[in-house]
């Protein structure tokens, strides 16, 4: 027998040469002191025979020994041929490599994480190639390398972007062996989670997008998933007003109250969500912008109010002209303008509500040197802001006809 270690499915062959022609010998084989499981087979004739046995997976590790008996063709028994247990010619080495450890140093992976996969065997292995022997879903495993002769192997795993899967295991195949050729078992890591899906804003809306004095609007932000580290003061900007602290209404919906700034007229505003928030895994969020909203909290005012004639006598019908700072809505001269000692006709506008004119007819038989036309606050601008008051300069009414005293 040649001197080398053998493993399961190897064949051990024993050459037997007789001093004369012999019949088929009968041999028994043992390894490590225990009979080997399989029965030997024989070939040959005359003085030259071969006894062969297939090593079984369960054969005991240790030196292979044998004992053979034989007879010549006449039936005379020859001296038995055998070996002792410590000859060391051939040794069975049936110990299979096993996996001692197979794990990640991080099992909750987010964007930017690159955990290390460590695989430790019970002994040095050969024929191991991580690209062929290890599969890790939802990511890419770099080529694994060993710094201790093939016992421990490490490699970097990069999770796939835009992926959300909390059920994953790396699997080891069985194509590797130890130095003697014994195959190893398969193995799986513990579960790991891949969460590289960035949270985003599904919607950001104002309940009122045309804001006037006294209005408040509810800002509602709906995220794609539960978020962490979200603070409205830091993460949301809404110009031309102030946003109160936002509160969580459900797992993904936040609301806050927006109050427009006074004396502001700006028809181009959007609320913006920054990227400083994260999801529960730590992935940074994406920004978002609301639709446009209009802030008009500037109250309309009376720019001027004047009569074309302030010394009014019988037969005079001066024109009253009122100019507002912006187009006035809901303005009705009968309700909103008072001019004593006379009657004001219905006022009309030819420029969409900014300038209004009407005719004043003084009362008859009246003498009054102290009069003003006054504008009330019943009108608004187009946004609905209540207007301010106005007052004309003084005018005189003298419609008393002179008489002959004597």
Predicted features, each with a name:
Residues 1-406:
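Non-catalytic beta-sheet/beta-sandwich ligand-binding modules that flank or precede catalytic cores
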């Amino acid at each position: 027998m040649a001197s080398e270690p053998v493993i399961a499915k190897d064949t051990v062959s024993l050459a037997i040469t007789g001093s004369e022609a012999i019949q088929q010998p009968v041999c028994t084989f043992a390894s490590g002191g225990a009979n080997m499981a399989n029965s030997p087979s024989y070939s040959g004739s005359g003085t030259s025979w071969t006894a062969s046995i297939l090593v079984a997976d369960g054969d005991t590790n240790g030196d292979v020994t044998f004992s053979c008996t034989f007879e010549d063709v006449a039936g005379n028994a020859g001296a038995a041929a055998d070996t002792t247990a410590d000859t060391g010619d051939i040794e069975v080495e049936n110990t299979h490599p096993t996996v001692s450890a197979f794990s990640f140093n991080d099992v909750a992976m987010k964007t930017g994480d690159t955990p290390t996969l460590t695989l430790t065997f019970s002994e040095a292995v050969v024929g191991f190639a991580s690209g062929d022997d290890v599969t890790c879903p939802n990511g890419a495993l770099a080529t694994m390398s060993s710094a201790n002769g093939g016992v421990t192997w490490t490699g970097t795993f990069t999770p796939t972007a835009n992926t959300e899967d909390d059920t994953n295991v790396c699997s080891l195949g069985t194509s590797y062996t130890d130095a003697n050729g014994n195959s190893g078992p398969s193995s799986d890591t513990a579960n790991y989670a891949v969460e590289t899906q960035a949270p985003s804003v599904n919607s950001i809306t104002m309940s009122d997008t045309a804001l006037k004095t006294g209005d408040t609007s509810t800002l509602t932000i709906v995220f794609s998933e539960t978020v962490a580290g979200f603070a409205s003061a830091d993460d949301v900007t809404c110009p031309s007003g102030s946003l109160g602290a936002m509160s969580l209404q459900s797992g993904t919906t936040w609301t806050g109250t927006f109050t427009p700034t006074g004396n502001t007229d700006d028809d181009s505003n959007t609320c913006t969500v920054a990227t400083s928030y994260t999801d529960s895994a730590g992935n940074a969020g994406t920004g978002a912008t609301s639709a446009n909203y209009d802030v008009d909290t500037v109250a309309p005012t009376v720019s001027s109010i004047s009569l074309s004639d302030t010394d009014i006598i019988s037969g005079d019908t001066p024109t009253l002209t009122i100019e507002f700072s912006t187009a006035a809505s809901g303005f009705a001269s009968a309700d909103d303008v008072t001019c004593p000692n006379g009657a004001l006709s219905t006022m009309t506008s030819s420029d969409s509500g900014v300038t209004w004119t009407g005719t004043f007819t003084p009362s008859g038989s009246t003498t009054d040197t102290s009069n003003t036309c006054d504008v009330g606050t019943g009108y608004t601008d187009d946004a609905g802001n209540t207007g301010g008051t106005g007052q004309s300069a003084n005018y005189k009414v003298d419609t008393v006809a002179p008489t002959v005293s004597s």
